[in-house]
Amino acid sequence: MIEINNKIDYIFYTNNTPNTYKIQLILLELQKEYGITFESRFINVFKKENYSDDYIKINPNKKVPAIVDQTGEKPFIVFESVSILIYLAQKFNTFLPDFKTNPLENSEVITWTVWQAANLGPAFGQYFHFSFFSPTVQEYSLHRFNNEAQRILRLLDDRLSSTYIGGNEFSIADIASAGWLLYLNSAPLYNATKERFPNIFKWLDLINQRESIKQVNQSISDGFKNFNPSLLRALFTNDPELINAKAPIGIENVILKYD
């Protein structure tokens, strides 16, 4: 049963993946600046806890992240990572310019926040899946999503000729992309991409100084050490040969195939 804790401002449903890291980041930022309290509740998708009747009441889409805002007269649920980012940014009037006073800046930040969810996240998710988690080599999929990942990184590197993704200030546009791009801090991906995308790594060096980013970087590092691809495959197939197969590329070679 999903229990409500009225002593906590926000309940945060997570499973330590890129989209949930976005929400961890903004909650940590709000905790530092405004003293909010939040409680993280891990949803084990490998045990299909996201399909439980209790969790479906939180998120009928059966995915993470989700939050329950307990600061009002009654608990209010928000799911989908970008929706949560916009909700919290608007509520605290931070990391997102106010539309009434700065409509153009507001639109620019929202545009790049939504861009992440529509482009960066899906492309990187598919590329990592077929290169690291897929039990068989699928050259077409690898080629397609490798090319798309390159296109997105080139676009973002051009964009980051400015200081931050959404403009001149740190915003939810940076938080949204950080959930995925902080993985580039890991040694194999760092070595493969740093020289090719200097502005992205200049941006990473800048945001890596934030305490919230440092905490999420540690979570990502721990995840690399502990994750077993077979657990993910078991969500999609019952074939033991596919579940236990060796990854076709492996994390050490991800994003190395440049045309």
Curated annotation (Swiss-Prot):
GO cellular component, one term: cytoplasm
Domain GST C-terminal positions: 102-232
GO MF annotation list: glutathione transferase activity
Top-level taxon of origin: Eukaryota
Family matches, as Pfam families: GST_C, GST_N
Record-linked InterPro entries: Glutathione-S-Trfase_C-like, Glutathione-S-Trfase_C_sf, Glutathione_S-Trfase, Glutathione_S-Trfase_N, GST_C, Thioredoxin-like_sf
Span of domain GST N-terminal: 7-96
Coiled coil: none
Family (UniProt): Belongs to the GST superfamily.
The protein's name: Glutathione S-transferase domain-containing protein DDB_G0274705
Taxon lineage: Eukaryota, Amoebozoa, Evosea, Eumycetozoa, Dictyostelia
